[in-house]
Amino acid sequence: MKEEKLSLLQRCIKWRENNIKEKQFILILSFLVGIFTAFAALLLKFFIHQIQNFLTDNFNATEANYLYLVYPVVGIFLAGWFVRNIVKDDISHGVTKILYAISRRQGRIKRHNIWSSTIASAITIGFGGSVGAEAPIVLTGSAIGSNLGSVFKMEHRTLMLLVGCGAAGAIAGIFKAPIAGLVFTLEVLMIDLTMSSLLPLLISAVTAATVSYITTGTEAMFKFHLDQAFELERIPFVILLGIFCGLISLYFTRAMNSVEGVFGKLNNPYKKLAFGGVMLSVLIFLFPPLYGEGYDTINLLLNGTSAAEWDTVMNLSLIHI
């Protein structure tokens, strides 16, 4: 009688405990996390492009248009309404939430993060918000790993590993770069670099990248070609570039925190919408290539041949910062 009262999930868990070893099951879960995370990344990109194409289909998206004064405000309003009335939780700072889950919540991430970040970021970016899709999809992937592990009653150390698998799969799936996903997880989330953790991370990253390749083709997100072979004499310039980028990253982080502090003092959400939306709309109206993700601008930089193109890209980079 007891056996009959067990749910299907409980029977699966009991069967797994009796027939599949813990380490083997972790590898199976990491494979599943890679698949689910890859499809989540594909869905996010699909929604962003569909919204963006629908809104900009009737005019040249690279030229100034008065609709650019409207779209970002509408996008921020819709995303804010969605978060306040549907999600009813703070979903900002995706990577920070993952680190908090690892350090304070034993790898447990709320279920709504599986879909809430994807929908909110798709609306924001599709309507022109100059933000990246990386942090939302990393949070989504980590939430997939955490909740999949929770379903099968895995211990907290395994949950933290699956959180890392989701993050690795997210980066690998959206960029088609499994090594980038692995390095991101090891460096940013600081998952233990042991053989027992490295193999699941690799499986998730490679699986996600493979699914992305199968569904969208082998074309890389950033397309470029090298006209000349790399020479050792260029190493000092590469080092200087790394130092400069590090300083820019530091400035960007502190500037973002300062702006958040200013907006945090505004208790009225409509004031935040008005100030933030208007500033973003004006910038996009003046500099249309700021609309959306910005990957087209990066490709322009990688393949640009004229001085005018380079000037445009550099000016846009300064505006982004």
Q: Which role fits each region the language model picked out?
A:
Residues 1-319:
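Alpha-helical transmembrane segments and immediately membrane-proximal extracytoplasmic
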